[in-house]
């Protein structure tokens, strides 16, 4: 079966209407994992299979450095691993990793109270939770708030068990309770690691210049973390819309309906 020009136009229009962000937005897709309880939160890749059942995005920077971002969820918690594969010089309690999330997909210019960031330094087991909505420009409109009881974040050094490199390098592990940030099928999402020796932030989305502690850009510059269902659908609703449009065209073709 060959689609005629009109049918192709319908598909293209459907894509433009229903799926504008799939082409233009920077996105990371997370995945469901049922082995979260097996994770050993010690700030390193403890055993080979530990983070295997999570999504994977390798961020490559212009200076040759690489950052692996792995994400997953079990319905109650979000798991994030920032594996800075290329960083081999360490500054304990100065290097850090940070994860920022918001359920507000409109992503305002100024942080609101539904914007959260979780920061942990290298060598620390004590994360900091930052919440938006503060009036102080000096703190990027974020203020420190109480950690959720279930929050875990640890900065450490991975070694021979790491999937990407056996050379010791910085790694940051996060377990973020979903109730602490709210449920959504699409989160605003930003992650970064700070290399104190070079005074440089490596982040996703890339090319956001902000070395001022805690290196949190405007939420309007964050990307998206697409979660599998409203509790965290296997695809976000725009994909269903696209698929439905495509199947509708195929149905019309099979019925040989003339326009």
Task: Label every model-predicted segment.
Residues 226-240:
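Short, threonine-centered small-residue motifs that mark membrane-proximal processing/anchoring sites
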Residues 43, 77-85, 170-178:
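Short, well-ordered beta-strand segments enriched in hydrophobic/aromatic residues
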């Amino acid at each position: 079966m060959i689609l005629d020009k009109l049918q192709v136009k319908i598909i293209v229009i459907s894509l433009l209407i229903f799926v504008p962000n799939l082409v233009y937005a920077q996105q990371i897709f997370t995945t469901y994992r049922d082995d979260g309880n097996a994770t050993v939160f010690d700030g390193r890749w403890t055993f080979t299979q530990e983070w295997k059942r999570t999504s994977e995005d390798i961020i490559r920077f212009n200076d040759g450095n690489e950052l692996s971002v792995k994400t997953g969820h079990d319905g109650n918690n979000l798991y994030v691993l920032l594996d800075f594969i290329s960083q081999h010089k360490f500054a304990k309690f100065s290097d850090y990793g940070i994860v920022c999330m918001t359920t507000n997909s409109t992503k305002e210019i100024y942080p609101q109270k539904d914007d959260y960031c979780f920061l942990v330094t290298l060598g620390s087991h004590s994360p900091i939770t930052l919440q938006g909505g503060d009036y102080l420009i000096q703190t990027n409109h974020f203020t420190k708030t109480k950690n959720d009881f279930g929050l875990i974040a640890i900065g450490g050094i991975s070694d021979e068990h790491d999937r990407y490199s056996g050379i010791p390098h910085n790694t940051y592990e996060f377990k973020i309770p979903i109730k602490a940030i709210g449920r959504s099928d699409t989160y605003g999402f930003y992650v970064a690691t700070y290399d104190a020796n070079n005074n440089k932030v490596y982040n996703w989305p890339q090319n956001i210049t902000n070395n001022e502690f805690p290196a949190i850009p405007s939420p309007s510059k964050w990307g998206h973390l697409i979660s599998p269902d409203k509790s965290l659908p296997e695809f976000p609703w725009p994909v269903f819309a696209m698929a439905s449009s495509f199947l509708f065209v195929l149905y019309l073709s099979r019925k040989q309906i003339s326009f």
